[in-house]
């Protein structure tokens, strides 16, 4: 079984290793109440300046419904990345439905800060 072809607009796409790291961190940030689920919520965190980074699903249908986020991320200097599966992203977010975009948010004194920074650097390396 081959993986479905990913829309070329979904750039940068995380590889398998980074996807696992991302989804683990998304799951932890959900436990620490540092996660906003959904494209609209992600947009709000960007506008308020409280987004650490944005994770989007490359298999959102149609993809255009989340393609305003990369532009906003670039304006606000927030790293963003695509993962292949909205189902996997939904599971990592702790909901039973697919999630096409989520935002890990800033929180003072967060225990996740070191992991968040290492993921931000990994995403920024993809963007270069």
From Swiss-Prot:
Subcellular location, record wording: Nucleus; Nucleus, Nucleolus
GO cellular component, one term: precatalytic spliceosome
Gene3D superfamilies xref list: 3.30.1330.30
One protein family per Pfam: Ribosomal_L7Ae
Site (Interaction with U4 snRNA and U4atac snRNA): 61, 86
Start and end residues of each stretch annotated as Interaction with U4 snRNA and U4atac snRNA: 36-48
The keyword Cytoplasm appears for this protein: no
GO MF annotation list: RNA binding; U4atac snRNA binding
UniProt keyword list: mRNA processing, mRNA splicing, Nucleus, Ribonucleoprotein, RNA-binding, Spliceosome
Protein name listed in UniProt: NHP2-like protein 1
């Amino acid at each position: 079984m081959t993986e479905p072809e990913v829309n070329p607009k979904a750039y940068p796409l995380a590889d398998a290793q980074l996807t696992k790291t991302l989804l683990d961190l998304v799951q932890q940030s959900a436990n620490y109440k540092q996660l906003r689920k959904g494209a609209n919520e992600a947009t709000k965190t960007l506008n308020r300046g409280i987004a650490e980074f944005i994770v989007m699903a490359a298999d959102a249908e149609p993809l255009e419904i989340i393609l305003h986020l990369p532009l906003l991320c670039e304006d606000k200097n927030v790293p963003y990345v695509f993962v292949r599966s909205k189902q996997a992203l939904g599971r990592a977010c702790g909901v039973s439905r697919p999630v096409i975009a989520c935002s890990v948010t800033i929180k003072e004194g967060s225990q996740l800060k070191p992991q968040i920074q290492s993921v931000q650097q990994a995403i920024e390396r993809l963007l270069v």
